[in-house]
Amino acid sequence: MEQWRYIVTEAMSPAMNMAVDEAILQLHSEGKVPPTVRFYTWDPATLSIGYFQKAIKEINLEEVQNRGLGFVRRATGGRAVLHDQELTYSVIVSEDHPKMPSSVTEAYKIISLGLLHGFQNLGLSAEMVSLASEEEKEKYNSPGSSACFDSPSWYELVVEGKKVAGSAQTRQKGVILQHGSILLDMDVDLLFSLLHFPSERVKQRMIDSFRQKAVTINEVSSRPISLQESIEAFSKGFASGLEVELTPSTLTDEELALAEELVRTRYATDEWNLRR
């Protein structure tokens, strides 16, 4: 069976987390590292925004700072994500890998099978819903909110009809980077306090809609699920979903050096994080 690399990194700063994902992508494109599945957490808890979001217009940056949270713009699309009581994953693999369909949506589906298996390993009755129809898209979408779990992807992972994972994908240098957030618990009021709304009424409507369409692992689990148990469940999930053997590893010195350079030149700069 084909071997992919499997890495669990210690909690890192928001800039470093995004820089590491990009460093793996770049060095994988150069053939220096194998396809990689990575799990990580954030220190401090962080609000990340999508590549195309307007930071100053959409985000209450003063509140982010007052709460002692980190802030970073991702290289992937999507909306705002609060990385707090959650596990973040990333999958980095060449576009031309035999397991990866050329279609963006189908590649997203293949990678997301790992998530599906992970939720099932935790004893949750998760399912993958195709959002091909406008009716399905509407069911999982909340127009007007900048929060990621309000926005539908092409395939949605749901438990009891509610979204349980938010993912985004980018393709650069012939490599796919898909990363996303697996929620263990969530402070919905905190998330929405970090976003701008035209009025309190609109904000409350978005919160109510969000609660109807998104859910966390520990809200639907019959027992408490820890971070470590989640890592084990999802690592097995990606191995079975992708039909590969995951070999535990660590970041190379070259990856770390490149990531530190990307922190300095991109992910820790206002030019990157506050643009648009």
Curated annotation (Swiss-Prot):
Acyltransferase among the record's keywords? yes
Q: Which gene encodes it?
A: lipM
Q: What is the lineage of its organism?
A: Bacteria, Bacillati, Bacillota, Bacilli, Bacillales
- Protein name per the record: Octanoyltransferase LipM
Function description: Catalyzes the transfer of endogenously produced octanoic acid from octanoyl-acyl-carrier-protein onto the lipoyl domain of GcvH, an intermediate carrier during protein lipoylation.
Organism expressing this protein natively = Brevibacillus brevis (strain 47 / JCM 6285 / NBRC 100599)
Q: Give the pathway annotation.
A: Protein modification; protein lipoylation via endogenous pathway; protein N(6)-(lipoyl)lysine from octanoyl-[acyl-carrier-protein]
Top-level division of the source organism's lineage:
Bacteria
- Determine if Zinc-finger is one of this entry's keywords: no
Top enzyme category: transferase
| Keywords from the UniProt entry | Acyltransferase, Transferase
Known partners and oligomeric status: Monomer.
